[in-house]
Every structure is written in C-alpha cells, then in structure tokens.
C-alpha cells in the first residue's frame, strides 16, 4: 500500500495524470523521488505510440512536442520559464530568488519558451522514428528524471521553503541517492549498448551546468531550477538523439 501511495504522490505532484488522492505524510513521501522516473516511462511509452501511428511527419513531430507537456501539465516548463527570467535579470542572488517566486511571466521567459519549442519541434522533425529510437528516448526520459531526483536528494537547497525543500526534507536521502544512482547506471549501460551514449553525455553536461548555475547564481537548487534542468536536459538529449541517428549510430 505504501508503494502505491508513494507512486501516487510522485504522479500527483509531477504529472497531470489522475491518481488516487492520499494525504501526504512522512512514509509515502520518503521515497517519492524514486518513483519520479516512472513518469518518464509514461512519456516515453506515449512517444512511441505517437511514432508508431501512421501520421504525417509534421503532425507526428507536433505530437512528440506536446506529449511531455500534456503528461506533466507543464510543471517543468513553468520552472524553466521562471528560471530564464531570473537569470536574464542579472540581479543579485536575492533578486533572482524573488523573481522565481513571482507568478508573472516576463518577456525573457516568453522569448526563451518560444525559442525552446521551435528548437524542440525542429529536432522532432529531424528524428525518424524506429523502435530502437523509441526505446532510446524512453530510457533518456527516465534517466533525466533519475538525475533530477538525485539532485533533489543531494544538492544544497537555496531556501527552506518550496517544492524542492518539501521533497528533500521528507526523503530518506541516502536510500534515494542509492536507488537513483543504480537506476542511472543501468539506464546508461542500456543506452550505450543501443548506441545512444551521446545522450548520456548530453544529460551529464546539463547536470553539471545545473549544479554550477544553481550554486553560483542562487546558492542552491529550487523546484524551478529543477524544472529548468529537466527541460534543458530533454532538449540537449533530443539533439543528441537526432545527431546519433544522422551519424548512423542509431
């Protein structure tokens, strides 16, 4: 029962998929970040379904773009937009953190979101779907969430409130880190065997950048920064996927 509640907590927070409602407590939140990667598996499964349907290329690419937004409800895009606004302010640490809490969407966020979707759509049109491509991308979507959960459990926090603090403080950090490290290792091994090693490199480079930016610019991570990482990792891994296929590796 606790396992199902733990999964429900993760899906209730990080997806728009309807799940049974439970009261969040210490027990069912302790390992919620371990269940977070399952949302990536759902996104990947729907991505493969879209790829397998006999759709025109542009319609299929549009589906590839929209699936992660529909599944997650845009929660990570919200964090991406807020972080882009904060970074574009070139203000001090406290000003950036204040911008993250501002519910309004600034001009820089709109510009970055439009640029993001244009790049994402272009890359989706460049990818020719095959079962192998679909499997690689599903593994990548799970991997990025494993890394995101690992960061929540191990990176310093910018403040003692907010989404990241809620899940980090409730987590059994040692156990969560152990599970997600093993999962990330297994996913990476599978991607290497499939010829998608470049996707791992892309994810790790964005992960490193995430740590550097969060420490230097914000004094730690927040829920918005976690969304910023996830969206950037997804875009760069998609670029790596297209490059691997173009180079004949996939």
Where are these regions (language model features)?
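Membrane-embedded alpha-helical segments that form the functional core of polytopic membrane enzymes
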Residues: 34-84, 134-139, 195-216
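Hydrophobic core of alpha-helical transmembrane segments in multi-pass integral membrane proteins
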Residues: 176-208
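N-terminal beta-alpha supersecondary unit
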Residues: 9-12, 26-51, 165-169
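Membrane-proximal soluble regions of multi-pass membrane proteins
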Residues: 1-24
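Multi-pass membrane catalytic core of lipid/isoprenoid biosynthesis enzymes
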Residues: 29-47, 86-132, 136-137, 174-188, ...
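Solvent-exposed interhelical
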Residues: 146-180, 217-222
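C-terminal ends of transmembrane helices
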Residues: 18-24, 75, 95, 149-159, ...
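Acidic (Asp/Glu-rich) catalytic motifs at the cytosolic membrane interface
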Residues: 67-105, 212-233
